[in-house]
Amino acid sequence: MEVMKKIISASLMCDNLLTLKQDVFELEQNNNDDLMLHLDIMDGHFVNNLTFGPDITNAIQSITLLPCDYHLMVETPSSFLPRMKFTENDYVTIHSEINKEEIEESIKIIKERGAKFGLAINPETSFEFLEPYLRYLDIVLVMLVNPGFAGQNIVNSTLDKVKQLKHWLNEKQYQNILIAVDGGVSVKRANKLSKDGANIFVGGTSGLYKKDITLKKSLEILRKNIKI
């Protein structure tokens, strides 16, 4: 994939779990070198929910050639990462709000496997949480909702956060760090976020997995709206 290309990361948490396998195959068939699989891992502690664990994500990874975009909403990612079969083709994002020792240990594990390292920031989290790790970062995931559950309304204070982050990264001379957005990424909102500087769009219930249109059609519409 091109470094600054616009990418759709399909949130499998938002898919129908009973048709997950065939939907992954459908995504592969409609890939224009601009798709990833977004895999949410939660521990019931950092967020008050449970989703996929390493066994499930490893099984999903075994049936696809698409890159995987792991989002760990957990307090101790260093205890999850060794059990996960991510590779150099994948993105692995942990949260900036966990303790420093966990972040540092996780960076070591992720970088040793050659994967891309990311930090997520919650709606109220300051960019300063990112600063100690800028030299390691490949991606920053901007949460537009409080993490934990699909289908939430966007937090209004995040509406201009991508533009602000892009400016902040430019000032720090880290222009090549990718910006991803997650939560409430509707088609209309994706267009604005793309113009503001977002590179990766997590497609969930607002933008990709819709009951009234096919997955293929949703992809076509979302693609058109993130191209600038």
Q: What is the predicted function of each stretch?
A:
Residues 19, 90-177:
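Conserved anion-binding
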Residues 94-100, 144-153, 196-218:
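Glycine-rich phosphate-binding active-site loops on the catalytic face of alpha/beta enzymes
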Residues 23-39, 83-86, 130-143:
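Alpha/beta enzyme core
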Residues 38-109:
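N-terminal active-site wall of soluble small-molecule enzyme domains
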Residues 6-11, 37-39, 68-72, 90-94, ...:
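Hydrophobic faces of well-ordered beta-strands that scaffold small-molecule active sites
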Residues 23, 78-86, 125-135, 184-201:
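Catalytic cores of alpha/beta
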Residues 50, 54-70, 112-118, 158-179, ...:
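Alpha-helix-loop-beta-strand connector modules within alpha/beta enzyme cores
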Residues 20, 40, 84, 140, ...:
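Conserved, mostly hydrophobic/aromatic
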